[in-house]
Each structure stands twice: as C-alpha cells, then as structure tokens.
C-alpha cells in the first residue's frame, strides 16, 4: 500500500517542505502474486480477501484446498511474474530459492509492477532491480531484507521508487 499510494515519496517531500499531493493507486482489483504459500504467504492471502484482488500463487507444494477456499490460482513462476501487478515473496533462502528472481525472471515483470521482499535476502538480483527501477522498467520495490545487511548499495536505497526497512518484518510484540 505504501508503494501504491506513493507514501515514501510524499513523506520525503513533506519533510523537505514540499506540499504535493500524489495520485496513487488502489489495492482493490489488482492481481497479486504470492511466491511461497507457507504460514506467512497464506496469512497474506487471507488478509487480501476483502480487497477483491485476483490472487496468484506459486509454491513447490500444492495447497489445493486452501487455494480453492480462498479463490487462489496456482500458476507457474513465469505466469505469476508476467500477470501480477504486485509480486510478494515469502520463501526461505535455500539452494533452490537463492536468486529465484534472477535477471531473466525479473524481466518478466510488468513495467507497472511492484516487487516486495519481506522474506529473505538473496532471493532477488538486487542489482537488476535497481537498474529496472532507474530505467522505469519496474514501478517500485519494497525490501525489508537484503543480500548484505545492512545494505551497502546506497543508490538503491535512495531511489524514489524504492522503500526499504532494516529487517524488521518479524519484529512485533
């Protein structure tokens, strides 16, 4: 929602004394791709139910009953990437998931897509994401985790269409 509503850019501008109202997008009606449907992925799918989103999922396991009950389409990774408006990762970092979103896979994303990684660093080619964000080939990205923490790529962190947090996704009381 932060990315769809341009909240990060708006906050930066307000702090600098710039009062400009950005026109953002709504979550409702979007196609959301969930990569990894363990506990967190399933919780997210449940939370998205009221927003009338088209829900796509990719996982090594088939959660057939859960998908049916929550109106989720199980699809290939390639189909999920090419069809989704928002792609969110919920995977462990293993040999099979490391760099799962390599340059070739990232190129399947729509230009207006938003990429979210609150799972693990090392799942996404961060250099390619930065390049795509700079060229307007990806609308936005939000990461809570990075391949190297703290991240050393200050250029990525300072892009107006990037939102980063310091690995706090699981920090709650």
Named regions from a protein language model:
Residues 1-31, 43-50:
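Phosphate-binding beta-alpha-beta segment of Rossmann-like dinucleotide-binding domains, i.e.
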Residues 23, 149-173:
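C-terminal helix-to-coil terminal segments
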Residues 37-38:
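Glycine-rich Rossmann-fold phosphate-binding loop(s) that bind the pyrophosphate
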Residues 45, 49, 133-134, 157:
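Gly/Ala-rich phosphate-binding loop of Rossmann-like dinucleotide-binding domains
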Residues 51, 70, 158-160:
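Short, structured coil segments at secondary-structure junctions
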Residues 55-59:
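Short beta-strand "acidic-cap" motif of Rossmann-like dinucleotide-binding folds
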Residues 61-155:
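Rossmann-like adenosine-cofactor binding region
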